[in-house]
């Protein structure tokens, strides 16, 4: 019985990861999604999202938009509680020369 619970948690983590990744790349201003880390806490999932932002984007607004998008997508796809969505902006993609 304990193994079934672990298998279910593994499936849930995979589903949460996929939903979070898809939600992240659909947010305007995200140049690249670098990864998602899922941790299961006592009251729900803790999701860490790593991104590269587009040049000129307001980082606080981008983080807010990603958080909302991820929470909505994960809740809809997996019907699980999301405790926290942490956004880690790992860089900014500069525009190509001549494209400004």
Annotated model-derived regions:
Residues 2, 17, 21, 88-100:
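Polar/charged, Gly/Pro-rich intrinsically disordered segments
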Residues 2-4, 39:
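Extended, well-folded interaction surfaces typified by the phenylalanyl-tRNA synthetase beta subunit core
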Residues 8, 24, 70:
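Residue-level signature of catalytic and energy-coupling elements of molecular machines
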Residues 11-31:
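N-terminal first-folded block
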Residues 20, 59-80:
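Short, non-transmembrane amphipathic alpha-helical segments
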Residues 25-33, 76-81:
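Short secondary-structure junctions
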Residues 27-52, 90-91:
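Short edge beta-strands and adjacent turn/loop segments
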Residues 72-95:
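C-terminal structural segments of small proteins and small subunits
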């Amino acid at each position: 019985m304990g193994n079934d619970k672990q298998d279910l948690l593994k499936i849930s983590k995979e589903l949460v990861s996929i939903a979070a990744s898809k939600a992240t790349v659909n947010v305007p201003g995200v140049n690249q999604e670098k990864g998602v880390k899922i941790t299961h806490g006592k009251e729900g999932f803790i999701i860490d999202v790593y991104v590269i932002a587009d040049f000129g984007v307001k980082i606080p607004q981008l983080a807010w938009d990603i958080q909302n998008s991820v929470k909505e997508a994960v809740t809809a796809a997996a019907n699980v509680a999301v405790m926290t969505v942490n956004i880690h902006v790992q860089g900014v993609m500069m525009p190509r020369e001549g494209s400004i």
